[in-house]
Amino acid sequence: MKNEKLAKGEMNLNALFIGDKAENGQLYKDLLIDLVDEHLGWRQNYMPQDMPVISSQERTSESYEKTVNHMKDVLNEISSRMRTHSVPWHTAGRYWGHMNSETLMPSLLAYNFAMLWNGNNVAYESSPATSQMEEEVGHEFAHLMSYKNGWGHIVADGSLANLEGLWYARNIKSLPFAMKEVKPELVAGKSDWELLNMPTKEIMDLLESAEDEIDEIKAHSARSGKHLQAIGKWLVPQTKHYSWLKAADIIGIGLDQVIPVPVDHNYRMDINELEKIVRGLAEEQIPVLGVVGVVGSTEEGAVDSIDKIIALRDELMKDGIYYYVHVDAAYGGYGRAIFLDEDNNFIPYEDLQDVHEEYGVFKEKKEHISREVYDAYKAIELAESVTIDPHKMGYIPYSAGGIVIQDIRMRDVISYFATYVFEKGADIPALLGAYILEGSKAGATAASVWAAHHVLPLNVAGYGKLIGASIEGSHHFYNFLNDLTFKVGDKEIEVHTLTHPDFNMVDYVFKEKGNDDLVAMNKLNHDVYDYASYVKGNIYNNEFITSHTDFAIPDYGNSPLKFVNSLGFSDEEWNRAGKVTVLRAAVMTPYMNDKEEFDVYAPKIQAALQEKLEQIYDVK
């Protein structure tokens, strides 16, 4: 059957989800039944001369029927538990919490279908179909990042992808010392400081030239346990995901090597502070292993200025200083699709609004994306590696993380070959297991991601439209909150937003007018969370659901102080409380970009919040 390409603007997102009220439920069932029937037929048609091992007589036996009934009872219990205790994040406009939402129907169907084969993508021989799909997905990741010779693969989640990124950086940074030991002519004339500040491309070029001695050089690298502290500091923004600390622990460089970089009042890495740290370390002859920039921070959705991190590196190279750059775009990575045309070209900023209008990316023609965010996304192509999670803004079921590398040759620095699953030098169509951290991995995940990418291309015509819906929905929610006040008994409760969203996350607080006690405000917001989550009972009957987080001094320093001051709290009060508690909405719903639809839900949300505040203040 021919796969017809849709014309510009024809992609209808409403056809790709089961739907808030299961509007496409019958379509999902029909497609699933067709796929299951195909699998059953595939089983039946293999070696038709073989007789069935489960006989008709067996299927009518008493023990068989009892076993089937027992299985049904277990499944009924699972159904009861799932329906009773699950979070209804499929809802169009009532869930405003974690990074979860509707999942794409083609991804669900592909996962349902492929899991019947139970492929293990660690080895091609156990999963020929899905291993090839994963290899294609990896190249699609690379194209999304504008990597010309890149490579990528699926991992279980962003934490493992971050660990793998640090693994790459650690091993690459240590290679010059290994070359000095094994083949010193490769780095002749370089001081130890110069060896510690060699650009990644130069290192990979030298490694490639070593030919037959590559394995010996690798054996003398950081994988041997040598040079782990000597290779330098790992710099992360204060908005870092906690997985970076775990990665430093596991990878062996240690937590003492991790330095948090302050963020500005927009919760983006402060580039001036970054430069101070790097130059200060250089004065003490301490190298920087690498710098992490975040695109879509976990708690604010902030987009670090990747372009400025790269520009600073370029400037520092004049002084003989170099660092590896990893972009943690676990949340925001798929957002790059909104900037790519159908030929994978990065759209000029001055043309962006017109192109978005042409493809129906946004309902309203205006500046939805700032120049700062645009420049940050464009510069991702200059970073060595990127974390990207399909199970976040890819709208793909868990678990599906991903990592992408700029230069396919980099994968050799972490490769291991086990003869029983992959033979070194063998001509295997899709060799994954030798170049990844994980062992066994679900082929169904690869099929799920592959299906999503082929229904929704990774450009403005496909995922760009889905990402745009999310961004526009977040702007509606942000504007709605900014206009909110509540009369609760004799109290007036104001709503204040943290920052205008860089991407699609909205953080906000409730504040009692006239209150100058930050601890009391924090308690109010925690109480709102309790009433808007599983904490206070059956979440299925909750009319508004959200999440929360704390911005505390040990993690954020004084970055939240400007926001805290804007609420009327003094510096002394900030120091006394030590944190500010905010409510957090990752606005992933694909339905709230339509202002008319949002306006249907807005009074419902307001009424639900009014009720929760009255419960908190015990207003009868």
UniProtKB/Swiss-Prot annotation:
Alphabetic keyword roster: Coiled coil, Decarboxylase, Lyase, Pyridoxal phosphate, Stress response
Q: Which gene encodes it?
A: tdc
Protein name listed in UniProt: L-tyrosine decarboxylase
Record GO terms (molecular function): L-dopa decarboxylase activity; pyridoxal phosphate binding; tyrosine decarboxylase activity
**One Pfam assignment:** tyr_de_CO2_C
Q: What induces it?
A: Up-regulated by tyrosine and acidic pH. Makes part of an operon together with tyrP and nhaC-2.
Identify the metabolic or biological route this protein is part of: Amino-acid metabolism
Residues binding pyridoxal 5'-phosphate: G158, S159, T298, D389, P390, H391, S440
Gene3D superfamilies linked: Type I PLP-dependent aspartate aminotransferase-like (Major domain)
Taxonomic lineage from the root: Bacteria, Bacillati, Bacillota, Bacilli, Lactobacillales
Organism listed in the record: Enterococcus faecalis (strain ATCC 700802 / V583)
Q: What happens when the gene is disrupted?
A: Cells lacking the tdc cluster (tyrS, tdc/tdcA, tyrP and nhaC-2) lose the ability to produce tyramine, and show reduced viability under acidic pHs in the presence of tyrosine.
- Reaction catalysed by this enzyme: L-tyrosine + H(+) = tyramine + CO2; L-dopa + H(+) = dopamine + CO2
